[in-house]
C-alpha cells in the first residue's frame, strides 16, 4: 500500500470541487472502495479500466488490491493531476488517458482478461453501458456503480415495474448480479438518490440469437409505448401483425410481458423479413 495523503487533503490542494456538469460524486469511504475493488475478483492478471476516477479513491483501492494494470480515463484536468501523483506511487501500474469516456473504445484497451470497474458519472452511465454491451465479449466482467433505479432496471424480470429496454439488452448479453447499495451520504456532494453496485458477467453466448441494432429497434418501439398492445406499439417497424405471427407472440400482449428470448425472436423475424424483401426486389 503506497504512502499517499488522505483524499480530502488531496482534493483541497488541487481545488477538486465536484462539478455537476461532469456528473461527479466523490466516494471517500475506503471500506466501500475496497469492497468494490474486491468484487472485481483477481486483478493480478489482465487490465482494469476505470471511468472518471476523480480524486482516486477507487483507483487506490484497485491498486492496493493487486491490480496489475489500471487504465484510468478522465477528462477533468484537476483529477488528471491527482492521478499522476498516484501513478508515481505505483510505478508502471497506472496508465492515465486524458479523454472523454464516451469517445473511447474500452474494448480495445489493455490486455485480457479485461474488466471495467467504476463509479460512473451518472449523466452518461447508461449511454456508456450500452456502448460496452455492443462489445460485451471483450470484457470478463463489469463492476459498476449506478443510481439504484438504473440497477433495478438492469435486473428487472418480465411483468415487473422496472422491466424495460435496458433490462432486455443487458440481460441478453450479461448475467446481472446486484451486489450492495451505497447510501447517498457516502458521497461528496451527496446525490439525490441511493446508489447500487452491480456485477455484470458477459455471457459466453448471448441469451438468444439476435443482432444488437435490430434488438435495439424492436425494444425501443415496444417500450416506447409500453402500455399499448404490441400490435400497436410495433407499428413503427411496419407489418406488426406479420412480425407477431412469425414469432407466435399474441398481438394483444404488451412489452412488459415479453421475455428477453421473445424480443430476440422479434428481432430475428424483422431481419428475416427485411432480407426476404431485398431478395424479392
Swiss-Prot record:
Keywords per UniProt: Cytoplasm, Methyltransferase, RNA-binding, rRNA processing, S-adenosyl-L-methionine, Transferase
Enzyme Commission code(s) on record: 2.1.1.182
Pfam family, one: RrnaAD
Keyword rRNA processing assigned: yes
EC supergroup of this enzyme: transferase
Residues that hold S-adenosyl-L-methionine according to the record: 25, 27, 52, 74, 100, 119
Protein name: Ribosomal RNA small subunit methyltransferase A
Organism in which the protein naturally occurs: Paramagnetospirillum magneticum (strain ATCC 700264 / AMB-1) (Magnetospirillum magneticum)
Amino acid at each position: 500500500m503506497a504512502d499517499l495523503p488522505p483524499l480530502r487533503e488531496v482534493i483541497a490542494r488541487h481545488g477538486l470541487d465536484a462539478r455537476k456538469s461532469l456528473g461527479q460524486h466523490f466516494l471517500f469511504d475506503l471500506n466501500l472502495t475496497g469492497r468494490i475493488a474486491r468484487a472485481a475478483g483477481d486483478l493480478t492478471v489482465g487490465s482494469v479500466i476505470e471511468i472518471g476516477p476523480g480524486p482516486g479513491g477507487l483507483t487506490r483501492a484497485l491498486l492496493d488490491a493487486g491490480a496489475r494494470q489500471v487504465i484510468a480515463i478522465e477528462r477533468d484536468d484537476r483529477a488528471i493531476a491527482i492521478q499522476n501523483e498516484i501513478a508515481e506511487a505505483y510505478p508502471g501500474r497506472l496508465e492515465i488517458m486524458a479523454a472523454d469516456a464516451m469517445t473511447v473504445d474500452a474494448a480495445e484497451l489493455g490486455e485480457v482478461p479485461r474488466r471495467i470497474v467504476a463509479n460512473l458519472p451518472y449523466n452518461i452511465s447508461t449511454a456508456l453501458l450500452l456502448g460496452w454491451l455492443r462489445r460485451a465479449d471483450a470484457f470478463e466482467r463489469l463492476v459498476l456503480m449506478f443510481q439504484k433505479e438504473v440497477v433495478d432496471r438492469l435486473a428487472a424480470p418480465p411483468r415487473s415495474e422496472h422491466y424495460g429496454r435496458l433490462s432486455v439488452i443487458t440481460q441478453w448479453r450479461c448475467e446481472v448480479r446486484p451486489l450492495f447499495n451505497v447510501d447517498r451520504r457516502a458521497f461528496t456532494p451527496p446525490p439525490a438518490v441511493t446508489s447500487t453496485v452491480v456485477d455484470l458477467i458477459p455471457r459466453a453466448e448471448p441469451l438468444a440469437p439476435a443482432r444488437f441494432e435490430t434488438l435495439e429497434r424492436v425494444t425501443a418501439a415496444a417500450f416506447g409505448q409500453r402500455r399499448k398492445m404490441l400490435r400497436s406499439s410495433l407499428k413503427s417497424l411496419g407489418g406488426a401483425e406479420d412480425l407477431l405471427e412469425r414469432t407466435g407472440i399474441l398481438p394483444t400482449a404488451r412489452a412488459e410481458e415479453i421475455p428477453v428470448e421473445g424480443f430476440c425472436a422479434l428481432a430475428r423475424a424483422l431481419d428475416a423479413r427485411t432480407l426476404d424483401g431485398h431478395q424479392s426486389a
